Amino acid sequence: MDRSIAKMLSNQQIRNFSRGVGHLRRRAAKNNVIKVRPEELRPFFNQYSVLPNGIQNDADAKLFSKELQPGERKLLFDALRKITADQYNDHKKVVEVTIDHEDLVKVWYINFIPMFVYGCLDEAFLIIGGESINNIFSVYNGMSMLASAAVANIICNLFLQLPADRINDVLGFKKPVLSVDQMNIPEYQYAAFGAKLSGLWMGLTLGMLPLFFIDDNLDNRASDNGDLLVSVANTNGDEYCELFCGD
């Protein structure tokens, strides 16, 4: 009886009957009214198909996907992805996303520490490296102090990126587990930006400590002393000539 009913119904009628769950629908055939359960009229899942109860586990999903052609799989994947995105957007509109205070503190530290270490080492190596490069290369090619600082800055930026990024793992700081929505809210953005800005500013300020141990006026004093000795020698020479040679 069920097989004859399925043959009598068209695909569109089957789709119409399959809309709705848990109640009986009626189909008029000539003068008789036949009661049909919607579960028995599902186009792809019925008692005559391989999956009579629908897709209930991974094995059923794999079996169903194997029966599809590559083009059909792509169309089905796009449709499922669109439905999932629509459901996600609807859920996003309803649920208010927040971050706990402890997670915000962790976000602050994991952004503050790398920038602080990077700023401190970069500034210190820039000062020390610029001084060393200037002392080495200025003798041979006349490199200026600004050019030496630029070369030192390039070297520091190339070799300090990786250690600064891994400093959190070395110190044992773990990133908080946050969703994409939580990482897109303003609280997360403000905490991360403020931590990076503060860390870089404090690191660069602390990195200027080598300036207290570098004598920048050494060359100027040596030049001034040399000029002083030359002028004294010239003065003494003139007085010696006046004394013994006369006018």
Swiss-Prot record:
Alphabetic keyword roster: Membrane, Transmembrane, Transmembrane helix
Cellular localisation: Membrane
A single cellular component GO annotation: mitochondrion
InterPro entries: TMEM65
Transmembrane annotation, as ranges: 108-128, 136-156, 194-214
Protein's UniProt keywords contain Cytoplasm: no
Pfam family, one: TMEM65
Broad class of where this protein is predominantly found: membrane
Membrane topology note: Multi-pass membrane protein
Protein name: Uncharacterized protein C03B8.3
